[in-house]
Regions:
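N-terminal phosphate/diphosphate-binding loop that engages ATP/GTP or pyrophosphate donors
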Residues: 30-80
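Phosphate-binding P-loop
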Residues: 8-16
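Short hydrophobic/aromatic beta-strand immediately N-terminal to the Walker A/P-loop
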Residues: 18-20
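P-loop (Walker A) phosphate-binding loop of NTP-binding proteins
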Residues: 22-24
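ATP-binding Walker
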Residues: 27
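NTP-dependent small-molecule kinase module
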Residues: 2-8, 153-154, 168-206
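ATP-dependent NMP and nucleoside kinases share a basic, alpha-helical "lid"
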Residues: 71-80, 94-151, 196
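Short glycine-/polar-rich loops that comprise or flank the Walker A/P-loop
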Residues: 41, 127-132, 174-176
Length: 206
């Protein structure tokens, strides 16, 4: 049996896999995801829609798709979002069509969404693809707060708000399949890569 037919059988058993990576702002999710995608073939990043303002250095279509609230609400009404949430006044959503397109190429998809989005995705019931939930975070709120201050993109009040949200999000850990501690990026990348490799090798999903 060729490697191509073996891969096809794996797809037939479980189809594409959506790897949902959640965690607080400043946890290093983007950096870890980018590193893993540079190592592992067959992964595509799902670019979310958002109504929030673009930050310095961000690129439309790479980091997010930046749209008005009216456009976002129209996409939701048309059923174009797999999940969508509002976080600190800004809306975020995962486009359904992009996931379908990635799977049609025989690849797996990585989603960087918040805990509310993960909960909504999990509450959808039976999906036509497998979803693996990973929570990535530093080992303490003190480390997270320091990273947010060093990033310099938010006011002290906004940072306090994010830390409070993180405290609440930690209560949702039992909903996740894996926890990755990112105090050292190299270690976190190795762990995230190992998770993806293991899940791709899984024959049965209960």
């Amino acid at each position: 049996m060729s490697s191509e037919s073996i891969a096809a059988k794996r797809r037939g058993v479980g189809g594409g896999i959506a790897f949902v990576v959640c965690g607080p702002s400043g946890a290093g999710k983007n950096s870890a995801i980018e590193r893993v995608m540079a190592i592992l073939p067959g992964l595509s990043f799902s670019v979310s829609y958002t109504t929030r303002a673009r930050r310095s250095g961000e690129v439309d279509g790479r980091d997010y798709r930046y749209v008005s609230r009216q456009t976002f609400d129209e996409l939701v009404a048309q059923g174009e979002m797999v999940e969508h949430v509002t976080y600190l006044g800004d809306a975020y959503g995962t486009p359904r069509a992009q996931i379908r397109e990635v799977f049609s190429r025989g690849e797996d998809v990585v989603l960087n969404i918040d805990v509310k989005g993960a909960k909504r995705l999990k509450s959808c019931g039976l999906l036509d693809f497998a979803v693996i939930y990973v929570f990535l975070t530093p080992s303490s709120l003190e480390i997270l707060g320091q990273r947010l201050r060093e990033r310099g993109t938010e006011t002290p009040e906004q940072i306090r708000g994010r830390l409070e949200v993180t405290r609440q999000e930690m209560e949702a850990l039992p909903l996740f399949d894996y926890l990755v501690i990112n105090d050292d990026l190299d270690t976190a990348v190795d762990e995230l890569r190992a998770i993806i490799v293991a899940e791709r090798s899984r024959v049965r999903r209960d």
